[in-house]
Amino acid sequence: MRINPTTSGSGVSTLEKKNPGRVVQIIGPVLDVAFPPGKMPNIYNALVVQGRDSVGQPINVACEVQQLLGNNRVRAVAMSATEGLTRGMAVIDTGAPISVPVGGATLGRIFNVLGEPVDNLGPVDTSTTSPIHRSAPAFIQLDTKLSIFETGIKVVDLLAPYRRGGKIGLFGGAGVGKTVLIMELINNIAKAHGGVSVFGGVGERTREGNDLYMEMKESGVINKENIAESKVALVYGQMNEPPGARMRVGLTALTMAEYFRDVNEQDVLLFIDNIFRFVQAGSEVSALLGRMPSAVGYQPTLSTEMGSLQERITSTKEGSITSIQAVYVPADDLTDPAPATTFAHLDATTVLSRGLAAKGIYPAVDPLDSTSTMLQPRIVGEEHYETAQRVKQTLQRYKELQDIIAILGLDELSEEDRLLVARARKIERFLSQPFFVAEVFTGSPGKYVGLAETIRGFQLILSGELDGLPEQAFYLVGTIDEATAKAMNLEMESNLKK
């Protein structure tokens, strides 16, 4: 599938054919607009409301047509605040969907849902734009090769490996480390793979978006001296934005990623933080449009909306989009319709555990709940598969023994089980890892661990060769060699204290 870009500026498409209309009703971010007979806009067309507010300031609000109501009226959702709008204001139909800038000029820049730069660095140096509403690639254009996408994060690469060109979900409640993990992945992929990333901030905190931007400038992912050499484009529609912007900002980010895949023929990483906010915004818009709510108050079109976004994220014969999506889980309930609908589209799930975070084990990835369709011997190889299965079996047995340990203590276990518990605790700690993006908080330098080194480390723990080392030696280290060096340092410190 090739993009057929237009050559207008960013934001709404500026075609010659413009239909005049008038605002007849405003309900929050939803507008009803009347058009002359025979001049009705199409669904998803971009409308622009123009006029002046009560103090004479110009108003220029972009909207998207959602419903045709009859009697020459349409219902549209605003992409920015509707304060100052009044009935009777002039509305222009642009004749096309919202179009955003695409290509290399977007790298290192921050955009809003309309593709307008919001980083005070001036206009985007490109005339190439693309509409945000497009069909998914045809079946014959898809690439079906299976290969692992190495992240340098031990727990991910060993137990729930990511597929190149696949979709990965980061599941977790509030405050367990989803955004930090995403920042680390962007950092590792830019440094280890030299890949281009697009980050879609959908309905998350503005402070986090600002922190991410500053962090990227510090780490060199965004090149301050030469913006063109940056490795990521940022698209933000944060918590304070109207639901229309939060609902469409994911499509804006995806459109930019599709250009890198289809025209530049690159492998792209698309980060969406947070896909739940996309669903939440759709739910708000659905209620404002008067649709009957479905299960737990969600929109009846939940599966359709999710599918239209997710099916465009795929690998073609030109290139691939590997998507990593943070999924907020309401009240830590994985059966909620929003995370449950997301599950159906994913190749791998990385589940973050509040229990592990409470223990101080970061990344707090649950090794037993996290899954991947890639963890098969024919894809990852026998050695990787066997090591991962043995790690999971050891941790599962430790989990089963925890009730007995809590009631009776370790001494009541058999010798075999005591040994298993000791190894499981070492494994649990060795699954932790210092992050590059958390260096300023932890004081520990970040570590990128290759897959072969990860497998070797866990094999040594499982074999019993390291049974004599204290478990704290395995906490927040990179490779197994660092763990043995840390054990020697701990022993020396202990001897000095004596």
UniProtKB/Swiss-Prot annotation:
The protein, known as: ATP synthase subunit beta, chloroplastic
Gene responsible for this protein: atpB
Keyword flag Chaperone: no
Catalytic reaction equation(s): ATP + H2O + 4 H(+)(in) = ADP + phosphate + 5 H(+)(out)
Highest rank taxon of the organism: Eukaryota
NCBIfam families reported in the protein's UniProt record: atpD (TIGR01039)
First-tier enzyme category under EC: translocase
Membership in a protein family: Belongs to the ATPase alpha/beta chains family.
Sequence positions that bind ATP: 172-179
Membrane topology: Peripheral membrane protein
HAMAP family: ATP_synth_beta_bact
Enzyme Commission designation: 7.1.2.2
UniProt keyword terms in alphabetical order: ATP synthesis, ATP-binding, CF(1), Chloroplast, Hydrogen ion transport, Ion transport, Membrane, Nucleotide-binding, Plastid, Thylakoid, Translocase, Transport
GO molecular function, one term: proton-transporting ATP synthase activity, rotational mechanism
Its biological purpose: Produces ATP from ADP in the presence of a proton gradient across the membrane. The catalytic sites are hosted primarily by the beta subunits.
Subcellular location: Plastid, Chloroplast thylakoid membrane
GO-annotated cellular components: chloroplast thylakoid membrane; mitochondrion; proton-transporting ATP synthase complex
GO annotation terms (biological process): proton motive force-driven mitochondrial ATP synthesis
Record has Repeat as a keyword: no
Origin species: Solanum lycopersicum (Tomato)
Pfam families: ATP-synt_ab (PF00006), ATP-synt_ab_N (PF02874), ATP-synt_VA_C (PF22919)
Quaternary structure and interacting proteins, as annotated: F-type ATPases have 2 components, CF(1) - the catalytic core - and CF(0) - the membrane proton channel. CF(1) has five subunits: alpha(3), beta(3), gamma(1), delta(1), epsilon(1). CF(0) has four main subunits: a(1), b(1), b'(1) and c(9-12).
